[in-house]
Amino acid sequence: MTEEIDFILDSTKESMEGSIAHLEKEFLNIRAGKASPAMLGSVFVDYYGSATPLSQVAKISVPDARTITLQPFEKNMLQVIEKAIMIANIGFNPMNNGDVIIISVPPLTEERRRELAKQAKTEAEDAKIGVRNVRKDSNSDIKKLEKEGTSEDACKIAEESVQKLTDSFIRKVDELLVVKEAEIMKV
């Protein structure tokens, strides 16, 4: 195969891996019953005028499966952090005891579990669409090479390779979804 085709295949694989990485990151934000620092990943605190991730203004720890504690690096940030958690609207009610913020993670109801499973399916479908869009772009690039003089056989083999990559990454998305759904639905 030509160097151009190798480049297309490498960038295809890299882009598809990016879709999987994004899906895994999104799955971390979908809580599955037990407390985790990742649950607060979407919380940003107003730190002297700039939106700063919560993890950069407080130590986040998980003493047990139902509790998250936040120890601010600066005491004057307690109220600001508490307010940011409320604004983030992630279903937590923080309690400020003057030194730390304690968040009790409520157990998930059956209805909420179904909502989260549905959200996971939506994220997985978005990842599949991303993978398919990469395939479409790669096949289009291969067609351009064919018009520019690359052999038809080489282009056909490249398209088959792109399809194999696509199938492999779609399978990976499905596997990740099955694991996440099981994690969400486990009581």
Swiss-Prot record:
Subcellular location: Cytoplasm
GO biological process: translational termination
Pfam families: RRF
Keyword Protein biosynthesis listed: yes
Record has Protein biosynthesis as a keyword: yes
Coiled coil: none
Any one Gene Ontology cellular component term annotated for this protein: cytoplasm
InterPro entries: Ribosome_recyc_fac, Ribosome_recyc_fac_dom, RRF_sf
Keywords tagged on the record: Cytoplasm, Protein biosynthesis
Annotated GO MF terms: ribosomal large subunit binding
Listed SUPFAM superfamilies: Ribosome recycling factor, RRF (SSF55194)
Family, per entry: Belongs to the RRF family.
Known function: Responsible for the release of ribosomes from messenger RNA at the termination of protein biosynthesis. May increase the efficiency of translation by recycling ribosomes from one round of translation to another.
Protein name listed in UniProt: Ribosome-recycling factor
Organism in which the protein naturally occurs: Flavobacterium psychrophilum (strain ATCC 49511 / DSM 21280 / CIP 103535 / JIP02/86)
